[in-house]
């Protein structure tokens, strides 16, 4: 490597790009790409709950469900930054359900209830920018599943933001 200038300059005394500089540029490019991908990584948990044996208020009462969601978020160590809870009116199909959304500093929680079917769908997504919040996402999901007491549950886990 004689004739090359110090690391990262990329020019030899002969005016050609040296091997050390090419390797350094390649490393910097790889590092920048890794940071972009790492910044997008997150964990997306979903659950479909059936035959929920919980108190009926968790399926019907937006205010009660909202308080339970807020408490579960706090207990899991996540930070709520906004929330919206909506009750649907009763129809010929049965009582109206609830949609609960909690916007998290780490991402979001969504809950949708179908009281006429004793069913619930849950959606927890956490971005892992700056720290891995996966354990907290699992704790939040576990707390909500316990609240609804389903006889049957289907869980899914998806790692998000891994780009090639």
Give the location of each predicted region.
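Polybasic/polar functional segments that serve as interface/processing modules
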Residues: 2-164
């Amino acid at each position: 490597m004689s004739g090359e200038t110090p690391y990262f300059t990329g020019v030899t005394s002969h005016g050609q790009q040296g091997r050390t500089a090419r390797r350094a540029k390649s490393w910097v490019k790889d590092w920048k790409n890794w940071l972009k991908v790492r910044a997008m990584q997150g964990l997306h948990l979903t659950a479909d709950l059936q035959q929920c044996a919980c108190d009926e208020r968790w399926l019907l009462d937006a205010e009660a469900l909202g308080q339970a969601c807020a408490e579960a978020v706090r207990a899991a160590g996540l930070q709520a930054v906004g929330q919206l809870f909506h009750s649907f009116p009763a129809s010929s199909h049965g009582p109206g359900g609830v949609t609960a959304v909690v916007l998290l500093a780490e991402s979001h929680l969504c809950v949708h209830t179908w009281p006429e079917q004793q069913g619930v769908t849950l959606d927890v997504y956490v971005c892992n920018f700056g720290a891995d919040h996966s354990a907290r996402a699992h704790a939040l999901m576990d707390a909500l599943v316990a609240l609804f007491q389903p006889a049957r549950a289907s869980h899914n886990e998806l790692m998000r933001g891994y780009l090639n």
